[in-house]
Amino acid sequence: MATLPPTANPSQQPLNLEDEDGILDEYDQYSLAHPCVVGGGRKGRTKREAAANTNRPSPGGHERKLLTKFQNSERKKAWR
């Protein structure tokens, strides 16, 4: 199995932090300084925002379904 020779070209050597400052713009530096939190499968929202904007079932049961049934039965009674 052939091995590749180490890179001797200075342009292919890994950069130091001092060298990166000239290459990276302010957005790249911000993204490196503030990494994303692991477990961010929440559409880019925090847990609090996701909880506030999520349709959760109400603990009281199916109020909307019961209300619709009641309204429909009242309409049928009015037609008779």
UniProtKB/Swiss-Prot annotation:
Residues forming coiled coils: none
InterPro entries named among the record's database cross-references: NUPR1-like (IPR018792)
PANTHER family membership: NUCLEAR PROTEIN 1, NUCLEAR PROTEIN 1 AND 2
Motif (Nuclear localization signal): 64-80
Gene Ontology biological-process entries: acute inflammatory response; fibroblast apoptotic process; fibroblast proliferation; intrinsic apoptotic signaling pathway in response to DNA damage by p53 class mediator; male gonad development; negative regulation of apoptotic process; negative regulation of autophagosome assembly; negative regulation of autophagy
Name recorded for this polypeptide: Nuclear protein 1
Keyword field: Activator, Cytoplasm, DNA-binding, Nucleus, Phosphoprotein, Transcription, Transcription regulation
Deleted gene: phenotype: Knockout NUPR1 mice are viable and seem normal. Mouse embryonic fibroblast grown more rapidly compared to wild type. Knockout NUPR1 mice are fertile. However female present a delay in female sexual maturation and male develop a phenotype similar to Sertoli-cell-only syndrome (SCOS).
Tissue: Highly expressed in pancreas and both ovaries and testes.
Lineage: Eukaryota, Metazoa, Chordata, Craniata, Vertebrata
Function as written in the Swiss-Prot or TrEMBL entry: Transcription regulator that converts stress signals into a program of gene expression that empowers cells with resistance to the stress induced by a change in their microenvironment. Thereby participates in the regulation of many processes namely cell-cycle, apoptosis, autophagy and DNA repair responses. Controls cell cycle progression and protects cells from genotoxic stress induced by doxorubicin through the complex formation with TP53 and EP300 that binds CDKN1A promoter leading to transcriptional induction of CDKN1A.
Region Disordered: start-end pairs: 1-21, 38-80
Family: Belongs to the NUPR family.
Modification after translation (UniProt): Phosphorylated. Phosphorylation promotes DNA-binding activity. Acetylated.
Pfam family name, one: Phospho_p8
